[in-house]
A protein has these predicted regions:
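Phosphate/NTP-binding elements of NTP-utilizing enzymes
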Residues: 2-161
Length: 161
């Protein structure tokens, strides 16, 4: 009886996570804070608002200052999309490959910290790319590498300049 109850709770949580990226990030995503280490991803109200704007529009440009957590938000949004939508492709483009790689690293950290019942498993896992068993993937490239020309229109692009 208890085992059946646990399975039902997990199923309900999975559905809730799939339907609500804010809930998923706040409840299950961990981030690396520069001074406090591994902490829960407690989104600020402006991050939640930004996420809703990103979800409503196909094309977005964000003019921002540094250290607002927008890259971390993009990592959480990318992970959510990868987990709950099969064959999702995320292309991270930045002026330097290391900058793009940092976002992939954030996605990997968030994934690694998830409870086991949310994990799908990797097919490919390296510093520049992650591919999940459901066909979803994220790749990091530099803007100098003709990034947009070699990938089809079915990629969700995250560009950091």
């Amino acid at each position: 009886m208890a085992q059946q109850n646990i399975k039902q709770i997990i199923k309900q949580e999975y559905i809730k996570c799939a339907q609500d990226p804010v809930y998923f990030m706040k409840k299950y995503c961990m981030i690396q804070h520069p001074t406090r280490g591994r902490i829960n991803f407690n989104l600020y109200p402006f991050q939640e608002k930004t996420l809703h704007i990103l979800d409503k529009n196909d094309r977005n440009i964000i003019l921002k200052s540094r250290q607002l957590g927008i890259s971390t938000l993009a990592a959480g949004k990318s992970l959510h999309k990868m987990l709950f939508s099969r064959d999702t492709n995320v292309l991270v483009i930045a002026t330097k490959q290391d900058t793009a790689k940092n976002l992939v690293t954030k996605v990997k950290f968030m994934y690694d910290e998830l409870p086991s019942w949310l994990k799908i498993g990797f097919v490919e896992k390296n510093k520049l790319a992650l591919r999940l068993k459901n066909g979803s993937q994220i790749k990091a490239v530099s803007a100098a590498s003709d990034a947009g020309h070699h990938h089809n229109k079915h990629y969700q692009r995250v560009v950091e300049l």
